[in-house]
């Protein structure tokens, strides 16, 4: 009744204009009401994986969100590796959220992509983000340290209302947050 299945992909690639990027075109052609895009929020990955500047990365995020919004989509921005990125360079990690929010993202979702953020630290970071951003905030925890459910519940306790997970925690590596456990605890 309240769940929505989104199309899922990345912001445009640097070598394409947003309206010419095959991935972004595919997100539109999927005809889902919701699109979730994951963007780099750790400067390490911006430089090493994408080979672009921080400013270019912010532009990719903002242009893609704005384009999807112009096509009538609800947009969830998944800030990939947010907690590691925030630990390394909080200013840049927060600027990725600002780029998405300023372009019209409906949800800002913080991803613990490596699944290694301890719950106390996660709550501290969530509190800082909550102070800076209005609107719907979300959490996407992985279970590498066996903390995905605890971290999802901690984010909810911090005022986050959007929780991403899977049934029984199935997912890459050690899995994602187990929605069956989260729902029962809430």
Regions found by a protein language model. Name each.
Residues 13-137, 152-160:
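Alpha/beta enzyme core
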Residues 119-122, 149, 176-180:
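Short alpha-helical patches at coil-to-helix transitions and adjacent helical residues
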Residues 39-41, 158-175:
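Glycine-rich phosphate-binding active-site loops on the catalytic face of alpha/beta enzymes
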Residues 8, 78-80, 111-113, 140-142, ...:
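Structural motif
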Residues 144-150:
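Short glycine/serine/threonine-rich phosphate/pyrophosphate-binding segments
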Residues 1-17:
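N-terminal capping/small domains of soluble enzymes
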Residues 5-7, 68, 186:
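Generic structural hydrophobic/aromatic packing signal, biased to beta-strands
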């Amino acid at each position: 009744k309240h769940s929505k299945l989104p199309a899922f992909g990345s912001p445009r690639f640097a070598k394409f204009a947003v309206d010419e990027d095959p991935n972004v075109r595919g997100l539109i052609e999927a005809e889902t009401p919701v699109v979730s895009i994951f963007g780099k929020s750790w400067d390490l990955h911006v430089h090493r994986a994408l080979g672009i500047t921080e400013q270019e990365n912010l532009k990719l995020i903002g242009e893609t969100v704005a384009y999807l919004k112009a096509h009538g989509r609800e947009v969830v921005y998944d800030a990939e590796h947010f907690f590691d990125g925030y630990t390394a360079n909080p200013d840049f990690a927060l600027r990725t959220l600002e780029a998405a929010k300023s372009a019209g993202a409906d949800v800002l979702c913080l991803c613990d992509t490596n699944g290694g953020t301890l719950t106390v630290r996660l709550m501290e970071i969530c509190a800082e983000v909550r102070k800076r951003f209005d609107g719907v905030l979300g959490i996407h925890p992985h279970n590498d340290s066996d903390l995905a459910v605890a971290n999802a519940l901690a984010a909810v306790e911090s005022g986050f209302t959007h929780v991403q997970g899977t049934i029984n925690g199935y997912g890459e590596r050690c899995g994602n947050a187990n929605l069956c456990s989260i729902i029962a605890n809430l």
